[in-house]
From Swiss-Prot:
Its main location: cytoplasm. One of its GO terms (cellular component) is phosphopyruvate hydratase complex. It comes from Lactobacillus acidophilus (strain ATCC 700396 / NCK56 / N2 / NCFM). This is Enolase. Belongs to the enolase family. Gene3D superfamilies: Enolase-like C-terminal domain, Enolase-like, N-terminal domain. (2R)-2-phosphoglycerate binds at residues 163, 338, 367-368, 389. It comes from the Bacteria. HAMAP family: Enolase. It is an enzyme of class 4 (lyase). SMART domains: Enolase_C, Enolase_N. The active site is at residues 205, 338.
Length: 428
């Protein structure tokens, strides 16, 4: 039987969960098998992220993606026709070379990523394998999940500067059992916030966006909700924060303007220590310092790496070269993985491999502008013992990922997943 090759690559403009245009791609193979992917988009973006190609002009507020769509349907389609869909590295490198820029800005990272993801899906479908199996092989584990239930920063219009307050199931259990605990805490949190006199409108990622005074108030609400839901903070349910410090860092004075205070690196560390002392269930912090504040991040890592997980997002932008630099400098102990920060499946997997090889945990992440695409759920399982954050257990574009994980767990037939920060994961 003849080997299947790529017959056609087609894109169209669709809309994400924030009502902004994004790219959907269909890759059709010569045997009739099709792979589909939808590309997400972020609200808070790092300086070194691969570049989304937007149209500009007056249409759709300048956010249209017809140029990216056209690039898929012309240049990329012409370049990939007849290629082997199972050679993902070659497919991705062909598009990188075709683009010819260091940040995928000519063809658009949104165009390239859509094709990269859809090709992987098509190859998995052609193999009659689920995507997680195609990407990950045999040894698979359900991921540790992190759920953004109180939104601040760029994700909500309120007074909280820290961007995300997450809850995570930390007792060894099935994914389903852990997720049910999260759902219970989420609904309890709504009642707690209402009792505190706050509105319970939702932010971009399905979390509540109460107009609180400061981060301590948000953490107190989470602590109380965990207990009222019948669980033990730090034993059943943990807390994590995405500080997104670049958004309260002032480049002019080199200080952090956080909730009415102006803080130096050391003063910010002292502020974080106060939170950690008051809330020992706080187990993970993402981007606690500005993406260009290498000194602050390295110093914080040296003093806190054995106490909490320090996740690098804007600091590395899922870029192997930036991760290599961070490892050499001693920054962080975990990598946040966002497909659209780097723009191809191959480079994403390279960043994951480099992280694991150097003892860094890996957390797969959604973006604030999401679709119903569940690629990241399969990816989180494929990497075996990783972590996943994809919003609250609300809003369909978030819940789709969790429902996909429930399906995968049913298929795997496993009743137990890894505990928080497993020390028995093979990082090689």
């Amino acid at each position: 039987m003849l080997k299947s090759v790529i017959e056609n690559v087609h894109a169209l403009e669709i809309f994400d969960s924030r009502g902004n245009p994004t790219v959907e791609v269909h890759v059709t193979l010569s045997n009739g098998v099709v792979g589909k992917a939808e590309v997400p988009s972020g609200a808070s973006t790092g300086e070194n992220e691969a570049v989304e190609l937007r149209d500009g002009g007056s249409r759709l507020g300048g956010k249209g993606v017809s140029k990216a769509v056209n690039n898929v349907n012309t240049e990329i389609n012409d370049a990939l026709k007849g290629m082997d869909p199972f050679d993902q590295p070659k497919i991705d490198q062909t598009m990188i070379d075709l683009d010819g820029t260091p940040n995928k800005g000519r063809l658009g990272a949104n165009a390239i990523l859509g094709v990269s993801m859809a090709t992987a899906v098509a190859a998995a479908n052609a193999n009659r394998q689920p995507l997680y199996r195609y990407l990950g092989g045999i040894d698979l584990e359900m991921p540790q999940t992190f759920h953004n239930v109180i939104n601040g920063g760029e994700h909500a219009d309120n007074g909280i500067d820290i961007q995300e307050f997450m809850i995570t199931p930390i007792a060894k259990t099935s994914f389903r059992d852990g997720f049910e605990k999260i759902v219970n805490v989420y609904h309890t949190l709504k009642k707690v916030l209402e009792d505190m006199g706050y509105e319970t409108g939702l932010g971009d990622e399905g979390g509540f966006a109460p107009n609180m005074k400061n981060s301590e108030e948000a953490l107190k609400a989470l602590h109380e909700s965990i207990i009222k839901a019948g669980y033990k903070p730090g034993e059943d349910i943990g807390i994590a924060c995405d500080c997104a410090a670049s958004y309260f860092y002032n480049k002019e004075d080199g200080k952090y303007h956080l909730e009415g205070k102006v803080l130096t690196d050391d003063e910010l560390a002292a502020y974080y220590d106060k939170l950690l002392d008051e809330f020992p269930e706080l187990m993970s912090m993402e981007d606690p310092y500005d993406e260009n504040d290498v000194e602050g991040m390295v110093k914080f890592t040296a003093t806190h790496k054995d106490r909490i997980q320090i996740v690098l997002d804007d600091f590395i932008c899922t870029n192997p070269a930036l991760l290599k630099k961070a490892i050499k400098e001693g920054a962080g102990n975990a990598s946040l993985i966002k497909l659209n920060q780097i723009g191809t499946v191959t480079e994403t997997l390279e960043t994951i491999r480099m992280s694991r090889k150097n003892g860094y945990n890996t957390m797969i992440s959604h973006r604030s502008g999401e679709t119903g695409d569940t690629f990241i759920a399969d990816l989180a399982v494929a990497i075996n013992g990783g972590q996943l954050k994809t919003g609250a257990p609300a809003r369909s574009e978030r819940v789709e990922k969790y429902n996909r994980l429930l399906e995968i767990e049913e298929e795997l037939g496993k009743g137990e997943r890894l505990a928080f920060f497993p020390d028995d994961v093979d990082h090689d």
